């Protein structure tokens, strides 16, 4: 069993979906957690309440990650709260489905700032804290299968997920000399709020289920085990890697 006792973990977008599942998975194994969230106070409170049952410290910070300066202040708040940060999960992301020809500059920039720019500067600040405290930290960026495949109504989103992987590759090189391992997790089609409306079309949902080789779409909880391994001290040599967790969707071309 992976042990995170005494570790301090920061998870962006930790009030719902994959971020929530990973945050609670870390708390269950002994990590103190601090989550960012955008709007849903009651959901963030529920995460903290559940985490506290595991005997760990749990904190929340409300953040607008479309504002890079607010994202930087969030990172500084996390450092102020914990002193030392051992784990960072860059999870927060948005995907407002839209036709390519209708995507405005404002919409593109908002998706870019939340999905890429905020994580760039949060990671920069947290990684510096790890180095200053001589922590062999772990950083995980939540990318997507969409970094490898196109989406008719996701041209802005797929762009950001490819960029996130490029960022991950580069900082894995930068931070390796300090004992900090950096990877990305690429979920397939997961049943979360981000695609709830899209998958309300039963025909579309059935098609997506058939595309997997396991015969079902993923749940946020399916992402916990691979994430926790990459974030654990048991991971001693995996860095700069994109781990695809998609139920076999990408390989299934039939």
UniProtKB/Swiss-Prot annotation:
| E.C. designation(s) | 1.1.1.377
* Site positions (Important for NADP specificity): 16
- The UniProt entry annotates the active site at 144 (proton donor), 157 (proton acceptor), 161 (lowers pka of active site tyr)
Q: Where does NADP(+) bind?
A: 13, 15-16, 18, 64, 91, 157, 161, 190
Q: Which UniProt keywords apply?
A: NADP, Oxidoreductase, Rhamnose metabolism
What the protein does comes down to:
Involved in the non-phosphorylated metabolic pathway of L-rhamnose catabolism. Catalyzes the oxidation of L-rhamnose to yield L-rhamnono-1,4-lactone. It can also oxidize L-lyxose and L-mannose, and uses only NADP.
- What PANTHER family does this protein's entry cite? (3R)-3-HYDROXYACYL-COA DEHYDROGENASE, SHORT-CHAIN DEHYDROGENASES/REDUCTASES FAMILY MEMBER
What's the protein here called? L-rhamnose 1-dehydrogenase (NADP(+))
């Amino acid at each position: 069993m992976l042990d995170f006792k005494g570790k301090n973990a920061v998870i962006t977008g930790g009030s719902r979906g994959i971020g929530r599942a990973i945050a609670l998975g870390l708390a269950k194994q002994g990590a103190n957690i601090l989550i960012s969230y955008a709007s849903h106070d009651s959901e963030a409170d529920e995460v903290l309440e559940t985490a506290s049952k595991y005997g760990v410290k749990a904190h929340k910070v409300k953040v607008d990650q479309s504002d890079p300066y607010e994202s930087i202040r969030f990172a500084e708040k996390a450092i102020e709260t914990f002193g030392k940060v051992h784990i960072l999960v860059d999870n927060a992301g948005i995907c407002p489905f839209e036709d390519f020809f209708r995507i405005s500059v404002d919409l593109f920039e908002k998706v870019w700032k939340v999905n890429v720019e905020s994580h760039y500067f949060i990671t920069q600040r947290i990684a510096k804290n790890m180095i200053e405290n001589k922590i062999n930290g772990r950083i995980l960026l939540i990318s997507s299968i969409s970094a490898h495949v196109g989406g008719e109504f996701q041209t802005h989103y797929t762009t950001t997920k490819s960029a996130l992987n490029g960022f991950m590759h580069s900082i894995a090189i930068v931070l390796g000399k300090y004992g900090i391992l950096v990877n990305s997790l690429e979920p397939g089609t997961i049943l979360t709020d981000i695609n709830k409306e899209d998958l309300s079309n039963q025909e579309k949902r059935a098609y997506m289920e058939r595309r997997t080789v396991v015969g079902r779409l993923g749940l946020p909880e399916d992402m916990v085990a691979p994430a926790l391994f990459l974030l654990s001290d048991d991971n001693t040599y995996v860095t700069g890697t994109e781990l695809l967790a998609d139920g076999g969707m990408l390989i299934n071309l039939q």
